[in-house]
Regions:
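A bilobed periplasmic-binding-protein/Venus flytrap-type ligand-binding module shared by bacterial periplasmic
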Residues: 50, 131-141, 231-247, 433-434
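Short cysteine-rich clusters marking metal-coordination/redox-active sites
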Residues: 364-367
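Ligand-binding clefts/hinges and TM-proximal coupling segments of bilobed small-molecule sensing domains
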Residues: 69, 152, 156-167, 172, ...
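Short, glycine-/small- and polar/acidic-enriched structural segments
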Residues: 28-175, 181-184, 200, 229
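Pocket-lining segment of extracytoplasmic ligand-binding domains
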Residues: 111, 183, 188-277, 395, ...
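Conserved C-terminal helix/tail region of periplasmic/extracytoplasmic solute-binding proteins
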Residues: 316-361
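Secondary-structure end/capping motifs
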Residues: 40-41, 244-323
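N-terminal signal peptide c-region/cleavage motif recognized by signal peptidases
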Residues: 20-24
Length: 474
């Protein structure tokens, strides 16, 4: 009897231990640690908006192995990709958002540590290279890159902007070690250096080639699209984490997809939110997230973006920041974004084949007619109005601008589309040229406008003169 009771007690205790073990396993607390770059505003759909709007919670799994799981979601913000990578390699972060160059370095750093990371999605980019750019002090007489020979140009070292600068210098036929003085400088230092006249130019990534000019102390003289080198920002994950929790990776990407959809539907609203969190002006955020923006928010792995990663690896080796290559076929892993698209009832293949900018579906604020030709579109953001006004032409926008100013309305920003590259420009930073019929076309550079005007028999105007011209011919 005693022996039987003892055996029964042992069996009961064993059952309790097993039940306790099973309960602890099913009630596991799973960390989801995400590194963001909030001020790198084209990463918003991969971090800032997911965090601020609580989107991740909507998609986290609560069935199967996750039935009783608890989630510990952690967020940490960085100003660049390098320190973010350091914490990912150290096991302190599971996900990270960064550009092609730091992303490539992330993969190399993981390999060096005997681990692996995966580039799982694109967030925003340009197959031509827009987003990166070069600016000069606003008082500088420099109008083009060709005038910077022998000058000092600063750039965040080993960044995607550094890669653009090296390609731009090479296209001029210059030796980067002899014909220009390239120095390492992060944007927070470069802004002050530009204002103090300590550097002749600064090359940088999103959003600084637009932000500095919008603040009035710099002028953009080179857009990354002139280098015709694809650039993007995207999301990475620790491979071991992805293998253990693939459903969480898909959940993160589904949240990113929703953030992207929200940006497309209400760019002004979310440009304001990004401004509130980052201090980057909403008017600059709209340059990227508004329709026909500087970059395209595109989560699909287009061949050009795969190429950008390969180019980044080669350049990092040239800069002696990497001593090995990466197998792009394994480092870039699109299985998770494909699964996220499918779970969101979206067609990944259709998105992969689409190269269009964020579309503009609007009527001309002056005529009320639908805008169908986007090559001369201009926009006005009036303070106090929740939506940006769109116009089919710069002439129409500038005429409306004059009327708004007469009414005492405060203007937040005026935008125009570059006629050659198609990128969105701050109109007060652009150059304009007329054709034989007097229609205004916008350009980033004075030289581009002069070339167009010469070919068309027209004239060149800066923003002030272009607005006066539009009012005069009304």
């Amino acid at each position: 009897m005693i022996r039987g009771e003892t055996l029964m007690l042992r069996a009961t205790l064993a059952g309790l231990v097993l039940a306790s073990f099973t309960l602890s396993a099913s009630a596991e607390t799973i960390r989801i640690a995400i590194g963001t770059q909030d001020t790198t505003i084209n990463c918003a759909a991969g971090g800032l908006l997911i965090r601020e709007l609580g989107l991740l919670d909507k998609y986290l799994p609560h069935d199967g192995q996750y039935k009783d799981a608890q989630y510990d979601v952690q967020w940490k913000n960085f100003t660049s990709g390098a320190p973010l990578t350091n914490e990912m390699v150290a096991g302190k972060l599971d996900f990270g958002a960064m550009a092609d160059f730091p992303g490539a370095f992330n993969g190399v750093a993981f390999e060096t540590a005997g681990k692996h990371s995966l580039f799982i999605s694109v967030l925003s980019g340009s197959i031509k290279g827009s987003g990166n750019g070069i600016v000069v002090p606003s008082a500088s007489g420099v109008q083009s890159l060709a005038e910077l020979k022998g000058k000092t140009i600063s750039v965040p070292f080993a960044s995607t902007a550094h890669g653009m600068l090296l390609r731009a210098v090479a296209a001029q036929g210059w030796d980067p070690l002899k014909d220009v003085n390239i120095i390492a400088q992060p944007p927070e230092v470069a802004g002050s250096a530009l204002q103090a006249g300590k550097i002749d130019a600064h090359a940088d990534f999103v959003p600084f080639a637009e932000l500095f000019p919008s603040r009035g102390f710099a002028r953009k003289i080179y857009d990354g699209s002139q280098a015709n080198a694809p650039t993007f920002h995207g999301a990475l994950v620790d491979q071991a984490y992805a293998k253990k929790y693939p459903e969480i990776v898909v959940a993160y990407l589904r949240a990113s997809i929703e953030a992207n959809q929200l940006l497309a539907a209400e760019p002004e609203k979310y440009s304001e939110l990004i401004a509130k969190v980052t201090g980057v002006d909403a008017e600059v955020n709209y340059l990227f997230h508004g329709p026909l923006g500087v970059q395209t928010r595109d989560l699909s792995w287009k061949p050009e973006y795969r190429q950008a990663v390969g180019t980044a690896i080669d350049t990092l080796k040239l800069l002696k920041k990497a001593d090995r290559g990466l197998d792009l076929n394994t480092f870039i892993d699109d299985q998770y974004i494909r699964a996220a698209f499918k779970a969101s009832n979206l067609d990944y293949s259709a998105q992969l084949a689409s190269y269009g900018q964020a579309p503009l579906k609007a009527v001309d604020a002056a005529s009320g007619q639908a805008i169908t030709d986007f090559s001369h579109v201009a926009e006005i953001w009036v303070r106090g109005e929740p939506k940006v006004r769109q116009y089919a032409s710069a002439q129409a926008a500038f005429a409306a601008l004059a009327s708004l100013k007469q009414e005492g309305r405060n203007i937040r920003a005026v935008y125009t589309q570059a006629s050659d590259s198609g990128i969105k420009l701050l109109a007060d930073q652009a150059w304009f040229a007329t054709d034989g019929k007097g229609q205004l076309s916008a350009f980033l550079l004075k030289g581009q406008a002069q070339q167009f005007a010469t070919a068309q028999g027209g004239k060149v105007f800066d923003f002030t003169d272009a607005t006066a011209q539009a009012v005069a011919v009304r």
